[in-house]
Amino acid sequence: MSELETGARKAQGKGTPPFAYKALYRASPVDRIGVIKKGVAASDLKRFIAALHVDQKVMFDALNLKTATVNKKAANNQPLSTEDSERVLGLAKLVGQLEDMVEESGETDGFDAPEWLSSWLRQPLPALGGVNPIDLLDTMEGQAVVSRALAQIQSGAFA
């Protein structure tokens, strides 16, 4: 649990990821629920979106987050609501899943999981009927569908 909460906070420099993505992916559901209930810091969300190399507004819309609320909470050093935190951690968990997949392949040199995932999320996926995976991130069920699609890439079911 401590790695989930402090894994990326040890050195919060500009290039430091806001989450320990792989630890988050590998953590037990009970551990992730604990982090969700504490709430994700709005400032960590902003750093996470920066790591994804995507416009903040695009990702806020994808996660069904209100820009004004996130900005206010970030300015006041407050956490997001439980519901918002769950969707944010779900997306961070997808980055961890991707990191785990790439590590299993043995080709990790120079691979930027957040950036790759961000690009993949914004491309129509035939296996999803041509839907962009980013359009499914606003619900946990949608995130589960995206997770399965990501896993199927690794298994070779589709690309």
From Swiss-Prot:
Residues 99-159 are annotated as: Sufficient to neutralize toxin. The keyword Chaperone does not apply. Keywords: Toxin-antitoxin system. The keyword Protein biosynthesis does not apply. InterPro entries: Xre-like_HTH (IPR046847), Xre/MbcA/ParS-like_toxin-bd (IPR024467). One of its GO terms (molecular function) is DNA binding. It holds the Pfam family Xre_MbcA_ParS_C. It comes from the Bacteria. Belongs to the MbcA/ParS/Xre antitoxin family. The C-terminus (residues 99-159) is sufficient to bind and neutralize toxin when expressed in E.coli. Forms heterotetrameric ParS(2)-ParT(2) complexes. The 2 antitoxin fragments do not make contact in the crystal structure. Antitoxin component of a type II toxin-antitoxin (TA) system. Neutralizes the bacteriostatic effect of cognate toxin ParT by inserting into its active site. This is Prs ADP-ribosylating antitoxin. The gene is parS.
